[in-house]
C-alpha cells in the first residue's frame, strides 16, 4: 500500500512539474519591476475606484476609461473609444491595441463599470488593514483591470511587447449590458475574432483556480390561463384546477425532472397570480388582485436558466416545454425562452492555456493551477466570444463581497497576480 501511495504521489508531482519551465533572466527582471511598482498599482486602483462608474453613469465610466487609456498609452498602446447609440444610454467601450507579427494574438478583457450606481451610498477606497482594502469595484473588476494594465507596463518597460499583437478591451456596460446585444457587443465580437487567445481578468476565485468554462444564461417566461369560478368547484371536471395549481405543478416538475443535472440551474424569480394580474417585464415587477373564493384564471412566472453548453440549454428547454404541455384540466400554459449570454464551454484549447498558467504558477512557487468549477461563476463578456477562440478567465483580483457595499481586495496578492498575468502574456506572445 505504501508503495502505491508513493508512486501515485510521484506521478502527480511529476505531471505538474512538466508544465514548469523555470524563469528566464528577462522574466526575472519583469518580476522585479512588478514588485518595485506595486505602490503604483495600489495608487491606480485607488484613483479608479474613487470614481463612481455604475453602468448607467456615462460620465463616470468615461472618466475611468480615460485613466486606463492614459496608463495603456504608457505601455505603447493606441487607444480608441467605441461609442454606443444615445438611445442605449451606455457610455461605450475602451479599446487599446498593439500590432505585430510575433506569437499568439491576444484579446485581454476588462470592464470599466460596476454595479454601484450614483444613487447608491458611495464607499471610497479605504485600507482595512495592511493587506486588505475596500471600495466600489475594487474586486469586480477594477482590481483585475489594474493587474492587466500593470502587467503590460512591466513587459513594455523591458521591450517585451515589441512586434506583438494585443487588444485590451474594456467594456463599459458588463454589469448591465446595453440592448440590443447585437449592437453593444458587435465591435467586441468582431475584434475578438481576429485574435487567437482571450484572457479575462474577472475576479479570481482562488489563487490557483482558473476558469476554463463559464455557464451561459437565458430567460424564460411561463404564462398560464385557466377557467375561473367559485372556489367550491375547484378540481371538478367543469371548473378545473385553476392557473395557480397549474403553475405550481409545472415549476415543481421542472425541479423533479431537471434539478439533479450538473451545471444546470433554473430559478423562478417572480410569480404573479390571481383574478387580475399586471406584469411589467422591463421593471421585473407586477401586481395581482385575487379573492380566496375565486379560482385564479391567470399566472405569470419569470425566471432564468443557466447552462454549461448549448446542447445542455436546448435539452433543458425541450424538457421544460414537454412539462408545460401536460396541462391540468381547465388550464392552458405556454413558455417562451429568450437567449441571454452564451456559455463558455470547456475545450481542449482552453485546457492548453491552463497548462501554460500552471507552469507559471509553479515557476512562481505557488504550486499547480487547476480548472475551477463552472457552476461557481455566472456568465460574462468572455462568453460572447468563446466560440471563436481559446479562452480563460478569472485572472483578476483576489477578494470577496463582489457587488456588495463591503467589497474587498487582498492587496497582498496583487504582486503575484500581476506577475502571473505578465508571464502569461509574455509566454503566449513569444511561442
Model-derived features: positions:
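Short glycine/proline-enriched loop/turn "hinge" motifs that connect secondary-structure elements
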Residues: 116-118, 160, 212-216, 292-296, ...
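Short, flexible, mixed-charge acidic loops at enzyme active sites
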Residues: 117-127, 213-218, 281-286
